[in-house]
Amino acid sequence: MLKEVMHIGITVSDIEKSIKFYRDILGLTFKGQAVMEGKETDALFNMENCKIKIAYLNGSDNIIAPPIELLEFINHKTIEDKPQLNKISTSEICFKVNNIENVYKHLLNNNVECLSSPQEFDFTTYGFGKSKALYFKDPDGIILELMETF
C-alpha cells in the first residue's frame, strides 16, 4: 500500500517570497520550479483553468526527509485563513536541527515571528526521549516547528 511520504505541500501567496524564506533563512536547498496547467492539472486539483507555480526545496541531498513543495495558485485566489495549532488540519511541519538555540537566534535576527523561545521536554517516561522545540511562522503565517533531540 503506502510506501513513503513523497513531499509536503504548502500553499503560499507569493512563491518567490516563500522560496527566499525557505532557502535563505531556513537553509533548504532549492531544487527547481515549474508551472502546472492543462486538463490533467484541472482534474487533479478539481478546478477549471487551474494554473499553479510549484517549487521544490530539500533539506538533504539523499532525500532522507521528504522535500517541501510550495504551490502558488495563479488563476484562483488563495483562500486565506489564520493558521492555528488547535484547528483540525495539518498542525505544523517539524524540522530537526542540531542546535536549536543558534537557529532560534538566526530566526530572530531575520525578523521571523516565533511563538516562544525553545522549550525543553522530557518524554522518557513515555518511551520517547528528551527534546527542545519551538514554533515559528513562515511569511504566510504557516506554523512550522524546530526540534532538537538529545
Name every feature range the model reports, one short phrase each.
Residues 56-58, 72, 96, 135:
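Short, well-ordered beta-strand micro-motif
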Residues 3-7, 52, 88-92, 131:
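Short, solvent-exposed beta-strand edge segments and adjacent coil->beta transition regions
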Residues 65-68, 90, 144-146:
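Short, structured motif recognition centered on aromatic/hydrophobic residues
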Residues 72-75, 149-150:
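Acetyl-CoA-dependent GNAT
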Residues 11-64, 127-129:
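Core segments of cupin and vicinal oxygen chelate
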